[in-house]
């Protein structure tokens, strides 16, 4: 992301590509929008694609007092962890053939399974998911649900077999990535399952 628009997904320093304080920017943005539109502060969500997915993970760690649930599409969680204020519902959508942020990780990035394990442990969900598969579209999509977490929180994963580094148009039971993320996060508020 050197030279491109990006989010700094960890606190200042480390691997950040600029000195922008993006966590503070998001908090200020939420405050300004709330001043105009009177937001429901218990139902603010973070979701993003690629580096935006990384930012969602960062917001979960460093601004969890503002964020009720997160979604990451083709994103990776970096190894900078903050103090999370409440159980955090998380949905991950990732393709097995992602050549930018590899599904199985690499020497610099955690694998999808490592990320799932982190959130499963943090939220104290079941470690044995319920799994369903939809083979009706151009990509086979496997949906794993780790339920029963603190405050009704779950961790969910959509695994797009042969999927690349994209915001997925391929559907799971008729829902595209945008719908899957929204239908997941909107079940929660800052206190857990609504």
Whereabouts are the PLM-identified features?
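Sec-exported extracytoplasmic/periplasmic mature domains
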Residues: 31-38, 60-68, 117-124, 186-190
């Amino acid at each position: 992301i050197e030279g491109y628009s990006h989010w700094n997904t960890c606190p200042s320093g480390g691997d950040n590509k600029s000195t922008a304080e993006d966590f503070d920017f998001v908090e200020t943005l939420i405050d300004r929008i709330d001043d105009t539109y009177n937001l429901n502060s218990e139902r603010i969500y973070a979701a993003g694609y690629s580096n935006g997915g990384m930012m969602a993970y960062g917001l979960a760690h460093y601004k969890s007092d503002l964020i009720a649930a997160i979604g990451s599409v083709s994103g990776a969680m970096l190894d900078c962890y903050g103090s999370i204020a409440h159980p955090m519902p998380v949905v991950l959508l990732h393709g097995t053939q992602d050549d930018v942020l590899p599904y199985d990780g690499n020497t610099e990035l955690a694998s999808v399974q490592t990320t799932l394990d982190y959130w499963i442990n943090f939220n104290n969900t079941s470690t044995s998911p319920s799994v369903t598969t939809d083979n009706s579209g151009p990509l086979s999509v496997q949906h794993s649900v780790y339920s029963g977490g603190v405050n009704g929180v779950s961790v969910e994963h959509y695994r797009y077999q042969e999927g690349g580094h994209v915001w997925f148009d391929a559907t799971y039971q008729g829902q595209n990535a945008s719908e899957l993320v929204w239908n997941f996060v909107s079940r929660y508020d800052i206190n857990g399952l609504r």
